A protein has these predicted regions:
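Transmembrane alpha-helix interface motif
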Residues: 1-41, 47-58, 141-151, 155-158, ...
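Juxtamembrane/interface alpha-helical elements of multi-pass membrane proteins
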Residues: 69-185, 189-192
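Hydrophobic alpha-helical transmembrane segments
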Residues: 25-26, 44-46, 66-69, 73, ...
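A diffuse structural propensity rather than consistent per-protein peaks
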Residues: 61, 101-102, 241
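Membrane-interface helix-boundary motifs at transmembrane edges
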Residues: 60-66
Length: 266
């Protein structure tokens, strides 16, 4: 928990850091669509190279990347386990009643785990290289055209920004609550059953603390006379630059490579 940093910005001045947040959000969406269209392990190769290239250019330390990804690996494990029982093609390797694990299910589980890990790594690069306020501003600007039809663009951007800021806070609160319960004699470690018991002793004080932080944030916004977008100005104006165009070209090349590989696999 102490190393949890997903959603936390890592300061830097790389080419990735300098990209417009709108470019990162749009290309992040294209990256997700591209990764979802991959239909085989060979298609994951250009995606993996693309992700490695992003982190190499951003110059974010490997240790920081791994620490920010570690809490998300539980999702990868759950998805992989579920896929173990979906594809029953190939030779049956293990069977217990109606539960079967075959060669096809192993391939499916490994493929889904790799694809989901790459998707998370790609999106994690956005939060590591973009301040939360810039992400909020970029998201709000992208939704601005829809404000004419009644979509609350500013409010949605604010919600996203607060959610990203609260991720590390939530993890810190959970760590502090678990330590406090342990100091009072509660068992907060020890295998899967220990994890379930920990949730029972940590959940109520954890959510109490989260609601307290939410009330404090609400009071702080009221004290600063926050009334939404009205009268709000920005220190740095968003602007597309040459680097944004280059990033778009590279992402489109990735999409083209994945399409070509998929056609070869058909």
């Amino acid at each position: 928990m102490e190393a949890f940093s997903f959603g936390s910005y890592y300061p830097g001045d790389s080419a990735i850091h300098r990209l417009d947040p709108r470019t990162k959000l749009l290309l992040g969406f294209v990256f997700l669509i591209t990764t979802l269209t991959v239909s085989g392990f060979r298609g994951l190769a250009p995606v993996a190279i693309f992700v490695v290239l992003i982190y190499a250019v951003s110059r974010v330390p490997v240790r920081r990347v791994l620490s920010s990804m570690a809490p998300l690996l539980a999702i990868v494990v759950v998805v992989a386990v579920l896929n173990l029982f979906t594809d029953q093609s190939g030779r049956i390797l293990w069977q217990l009643g109606f539960l079967r694990i075959s060669e096809g299910s192993l391939r499916s589980a490994a493929f889904m785990a790799c694809r989901l890990t790459l998707m998370m790594a790609g999106m994690n690069a956005i939060t590591l290289t973009t301040p939360t306020l810039d992400l909020t501003a970029g998201f709000e600007r992208l939704l601005a055209p829809f404000a004419r039809v009644g979509l609350p663009a500013h409010e949605l951007g604010m919600i996203m920004g607060i959610a990203l800021r609260f991720m590390p806070q939530f993890a810190t609160e959970m760590k502090q609550t678990a330590d406090a319960q342990a100091s009072r004699g509660a068992r907060v470690t020890g295998g899967p059953l220990g994890g379930v018991r920990m949730l029972g002793s940590v959940a109520i004080p954890l959510f109490t603390g989260v609601f307290r932080h939410a009330e404090t944030l609400s009071a702080a916004m009221d004290a600063r006379c926050y009334h939404g977008e009205q009268g709000r100005t920005r220190l740095h104006a968003l602007a597309f630059r040459r680097g944004d165009a280059l990033a778009a070209v590279v992402t489109m090349l990735l999409f083209a490579c994945v399409i070509v590989v998929n056609l070869q696999l058909v």
